[in-house]
């Protein structure tokens, strides 16, 4: 990585010039709350496997001590604050991935070190027999809509906003936050409403992963109060299928590219509520998406049974690493296609760190336990794949330049709709189930400046037309 302190808050701070040059305006950090990386420690194939991702929280009000660069006590708070301050100085917001759906105390056989010992029945959802509901897939489920737990979550988020100045939160398995004490989904969950209306949180971003491991899927229907954005899982799934050439997905792809109006086109929520993504920490990297047809999680020690099977990927003709120049060229073309579509879609784009230089996890789509070369960013690929990096940088700048894509300009002076879908012929928007071709045009008027050659100054408007 070329930094003095890799794997720490200081290491990220050292990479701020890189992020700024790329054009990044916000970073979403995977869990930074204190967690025990030795939970589930195993030895598999000569590797020590740990909790690398940090989704099993131990302390909700403290940064993880393992992310400090120096060994002094209590340095983690100072170093994290310094990182956030410097990111802000460079125009980059900070979003924290927070986990309030479960804790590290596990199921009935798990340890007792916090909420189990304070009041097990208040803090956790329990069956009538006293067992733990497991809507999180991690052994227990926090009883989020109990008044006591609501207050803890509110105080925790206020703490990170007031003392650390974070700009927002992404809520892991957020649908759990809308369940009643018996697991029933609530129409108007008090916790979600309180978060949306809290005066301390009024200016921060609230982003939901709008599903959970219990089968509740709320993309487009998450209780929002005009405040909540969502990771758009339908964008990921349907665009992946369309981009690799599958039938049946062109009409859905058109909706996703144009801001998912079927999901976010209501009176209050708009397309900015859609966090558009093709990759994240869960699943394949973008390079692996076009290098593997199947997951390869053998190194995790579960006989390749863990991780998602529905990846909607395509290996471009060969599984895994290839020395064939034609296959590698096709993979890079597919990556460019994906990048261009993502950054020319209405909504808020998000991509996984390292996608901009073809980082690989060697087909592992669930690298939660791999604190090694499988998960680490291979910065040597940056120079090797400079072409892809420059394409990402260009597309980010292109998106910033063209406000028509973002829907942040005046109506087109030529009478074009702000966004239109086309098939083989202009203005033919009859996208059929057999379609594999799709065109989208964004149109609007930009203020170009003042005409100094006339007697009175007037603003000139120029057309901003973008064809995808």
Question: Where are these predicted regions, by residue range?
Answer:
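Substrate-binding/active-site clefts of carbohydrate-active enzymes
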Residues: 1-166, 173-200, 216, 263
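Glycine- and acidic
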Residues: 2, 66, 139-142, 175-176, ...
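Non-transmembrane alpha-helical segments in soluble domains
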Residues: 13-21, 84, 157-161, 192-196, ...
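A residue-level signal for conserved active-site and pocket-lining positions in enzyme catalytic cores
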Residues: 29, 281, 395
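Extended hydrophobic/aromatic segments used for targeting, binding, or gating
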Residues: 43-60, 361-393
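Conserved alpha/beta catalytic core and glycan-binding cleft of carbohydrate-active enzymes
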Residues: 165, 178-182, 186-353, 357, ...
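Catalytic cores of secreted or luminal carbohydrate-active enzymes
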Residues: 383-417
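Short hydrophobic/aromatic beta-strand or adjacent loop that forms the aromatic wall/cage
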Residues: 435-439
